Amino acid sequence: MGATSQKELQQEFVIVGEPVVPGIGLGKSLLLGKSSLRIRELTLPQEEVEHEINRYYKALKESRSDLAALEKKAKGKQGYQEIASILQAHLEIIKDPLLTEEVVKTIRKDRKNAEFVFSSVMGEIEKSLCAVQKTTAIAVDRIQDIHDISNRVIGHLCCQHKSSLGESDQNLIVFSEELTPSEAANANPKYIRGFVSLEGSKTSHTAIVSLAKNIPYVANFSAESWQRIREYNGNLVLINGEKGEITFNPKLSTIQAYYRKQSAVSMTVPIQIEKTQPLISLSAQIVGVDELGSISREFPGTTIGLFRSEFMAFSLGRLPFVEEQVAEYTKLVQFSCSDINVLRLFDFGEDKVCPFIASAHRSVRWLLEQETILRGQLQAIAIASRQGKLKVLIPGVLDASEIILVKQMFQEEVQLQNGISENIIWGSMIEIPSAVWMIEEILQESSFIALGTNDLAQYTLGMSRERSLPGNWKQVPHPSVIRMIHYVAARAKQRNIPVSVCGEMAGDHLLLPMFIGFGVRELSVVAPAIHSLKMRLLALNSKECSRLAKQLLRARTYEEVHKLLNM
């Protein structure tokens, strides 16, 4: 591909990637280069070995200070608990004895320079992750974490660092082949108006950080497109995180059109499709009650559709005490909104590892194995029930027996704590195929149902959620997943039990008409997605939604689903 002419570089030009985080942003493009650090292998004289070890310790200390400062900054801001938990994980990795003992031992034994030894050790860790976990979502995140930490420590060893995205004083759209979580965490959202990376996914740590900061993010471009992007460094850019579009040198009319669409919908527009169409609610997901203030200001009346209680442990670096849980849950109970708020029981396992507790189980089976922890949480819920009503969601159920056990334990705690049993409304999270086929029995024990689409798709297809998947799965759901969602929604509708949907699919505006057509009553999404979903809802009507839903149920391939959703 030849170089782009000067005239072409000044014309409006659009490149399309994959949407990761929704939103619109305008700014000057800033291309972050790959690390130019070249690690050379050096053999040291014996008298320099201890000095080299001290130099390594200093680099580790400086790296820990960097991360601790970022974590402290994140902990002090509303809605940033997930960012803090990711940075806490980086701190735990960098404190690992392997990174001190193994590296120091090798420097002493082989008399090699710290950069070379550290890089080799981190490379071996990455190889072992790839060998054990293949290309799972967990492995991809861990490898990205390893890259991030390696670059930070080696940067200190070589006295070279990337410029901080927190120091910008102009509006920028940041382009990077591999955008790291700590780079995103350090970005000042006042000036950093968008992220664009060669590769990325909606479930990556970088995406989680970007979403928490409400910074639009687009990723996954061909090598040819990325090469062309590099030629536009320094040009004005408009990023559309809903469509995955990057517009270079946007005309004034293009910019005005985008922002007219964005401002056309008031944040408080009623979410009623039409008079004859049942209400479909948009509720907010949170990871801490300190987000309630911003939800109330930006989206008045919005219900909390999912409080992810396990993030209390990630933020604290330990399991929360019962008293701490009571304080959080009471605030959730008392939060004024249009419906009853939803608390999900601790959902540990796989990529969400509970601090200091190793277990092969996940979700409700993890809780039943760790009965003391479960009873502590149920005790806190029982105490909070004195203040009002609360919906409680049991994660990852296999069948009705697990629901019965949890409810029995709760009744015991309610009696001990003088709680009000009637104030707690029990629901079940359907995210495992076995639960889909046991839905009749599960509905008998549940007052509401939440479909967790991320895990449901992953376990149904036997795959990772990450970019290694074949075909179009990362853009559209497989027909089998669509049919499972419909099956659950239809069975629940027969019993007049409300169904909500959470996960990436809930925030996908292309799937909105399908959910409405299936009779889903609520979509639980991260706060930044609410505005764009409201905009999409204004353009829908019930007849078209029902028609599309029926067509999607007849689809046999990814391609047919993709065609129907993009008609």
From Swiss-Prot:
PROSITE patterns found in the cross-reference section: PEP_ENZYMES_2 (PS00742)
GO BP, one annotated term: phosphoenolpyruvate-dependent sugar phosphotransferase system
Keywords, in A-Z order: Cytoplasm, Kinase, Magnesium, Metal-binding, Phosphotransferase system, Sugar transport, Transferase, Transport
Key word Isomerase present: no
Main location: cytoplasm
Class of the enzyme per the UniProt entry, highest EC level: transferase
Binding site for phosphoenolpyruvate: 308, 344, 454-455, 465
Spans through the membrane: none
List of catalytic residues: 205 (tele-phosphohistidine intermediate), 502 (proton donor)
Any Pfam family matching the protein: PEP-utilisers_N
Domain of life according to the entry: Bacteria
GO MF term list: kinase activity; metal ion binding; phosphoenolpyruvate-protein phosphotransferase activity
Catalytic activity from the UniProt record: L-histidyl-[protein] + phosphoenolpyruvate = N(pros)-phospho-L-histidyl-[protein] + pyruvate
Binding-site positions, Mg(2+): 431, 455
Cofactor(s) recorded in Swiss-Prot or TrEMBL: Mg(2+)
EC number(s) stated in the UniProt entry for this protein: 2.7.3.9
GO cellular component: cytoplasm
Localization of this protein: Cytoplasm
Family (UniProt): Belongs to the PEP-utilizing enzyme family.
Subunit structure: Homodimer.
PANTHER family registered for this protein in UniProt: PHOSPHOENOLPYRUVATE-PROTEIN PHOSPHOTRANSFERASE
UniProt remark on domains: The N-terminal domain contains the HPr binding site, the central domain the pyrophosphate/phosphate carrier histidine, and the C-terminal domain the pyruvate binding site.
Note: The reaction takes place in three steps, mediated by a phosphocarrier histidine residue located on the surface of the central domain. The two first partial reactions are catalyzed at an active site located on the N-terminal domain, and the third partial reaction is catalyzed at an active site located on the C-terminal domain. For catalytic turnover, the central domain swivels from the concave surface of the N-terminal domain to that of the C-terminal domain.
Record's function text: General (non sugar-specific) component of the phosphoenolpyruvate-dependent sugar phosphotransferase system (sugar PTS). This major carbohydrate active-transport system catalyzes the phosphorylation of incoming sugar substrates concomitantly with their translocation across the cell membrane. Enzyme I transfers the phosphoryl group from phosphoenolpyruvate (PEP) to the phosphoryl carrier protein (HPr).
The protein's name: Phosphoenolpyruvate-protein phosphotransferase
